[in-house]
């Protein structure tokens, strides 16, 4: 691991390097965060460390939908008021949360935890497509689904992922739909307002 120069404590440099794993945080930003925590908010730094350790220890993936949960099966999958025959496929738990905030969707989810990206060696296995297929078709897991809504992002990789999944599911006779184009091309659900997402879900088109 990279160490600091003369006079730089190794523990500080390790903290800076650790903060750089956050998206959008470069060396300068990580350094500012580290110095702020140590200089102005040591209590906050301790709370952050404890919360991170607790989350890393207790949060794992739902055995049905693959989202984050502290139980074997998440609350959404266990909710009897949800329509288990309709499945919405999203890239991340953050995307799932955005759709939930629209209050327009009452089905269940499957979270890919990514999208197809051959250049990054991310293929069908890495985004759990075997598990998705089982969830959509196996009666023991809530299948067969009456409809699968593809809510991957409208990026080139998200579109390619939606196409791949759509062909896979249609070959099994499952109805597949895609979010309407209210979501901007190149846009990610995490950064789109709830009203736009709600309209995209309601106006979804069959593939």
UniProtKB/Swiss-Prot annotation:
SMART domains named in the record: TOPRIM (SM00493)
UniProt-listed CDD domains: TOPRIM_recR (cd01025)
This protein's UniProt keywords: DNA damage, DNA recombination, DNA repair, Metal-binding, Zinc, Zinc-finger
Listed GO biological process terms: DNA recombination; DNA repair
SUPFAM superfamilies: Recombination protein RecR
Pfam families, A to Z: RecR_C, RecR_HhH, RecR_ZnF, Toprim_4
Chain intervals annotated as zinc finger (C4-type): 62-77
GO molecular function, one term: DNA binding
Domain Toprim stretches: 85-184
Family, as annotated: Belongs to the RecR family.
Function according to Swiss-Prot or TrEMBL: May play a role in DNA repair. It seems to be involved in an RecBC-independent recombinational process of DNA repair. It may act with RecF and RecO.
Protein name: Recombination protein RecR
Originating organism: Ralstonia nicotianae (strain ATCC BAA-1114 / GMI1000)
Gene: recR
